[in-house]
Amino acid sequence: MKLTPEMLTGKSREHLVNLPTTHSSNHFLQTQAVQAFQALQQSAAKNGFNLQPASSFRDFERQQLIWNSKFKGERKVHDDAGKALDLNQLDDWQKCQAILRWSALLRLVVIIGERKWIFLILIFCHEVNLYNWSLGNMKKAATSLN
């Protein structure tokens, strides 16, 4: 399927399917990404991990709401160490930089059609065993997307 500008900017969901999970029915991915994620989940389960999605596709309106809430200080924005920032101390450009510190990569994943979502696992792997397991399975999972 050729991705349209509407798909790439979160204005359309026609290229997405629901990712069934036990915790939420609000995760949407492209068909190939669902298949790859489910294969990764099965592999993780065999190795003792309960791998669940933390985030997935967000439409434009939802992403705009999140951005605006952060910019206005209604939602927390964190520094590199994960400590909440006082946005009242920042000018508008600094606020944008602070928000993008944790948001840019996630939005980029949606923009490029979610074909690279698998690499996000490295960002969220704070446990050494899960990190090592994910490194070992990255190439295999990425290959299944092709």
Swiss-Prot record:
List GO molecular-function terms, semicolon-separated. Answer: peptidase activity
Q: Set out the biological process GO terms recorded for this chain's protein.
A: proteolysis
* PANTHER family, per database record: D-ALANYL-D-ALANINE CARBOXYPEPTIDASE, PEPTIDOGLYCAN L-ALANYL-D-GLUTAMATE ENDOPEPTIDASE CWLK
Name of protein: Uncharacterized protein HI_0101
Q: Where are the transmembrane segments?
A: none
Coiled-coil annotation: which residues? none
Q: What InterPro entries does the record tag this protein with?
A: Bact_PeptidoProc_Enz, Hedgehog_sig/DD-Pept_Zn-bd_sf, Pept_M15B
Please indicate which superkingdom the organism of origin belongs to.
Bacteria
- State the organism's lineage: Bacteria, Pseudomonadati, Pseudomonadota, Gammaproteobacteria, Pasteurellales
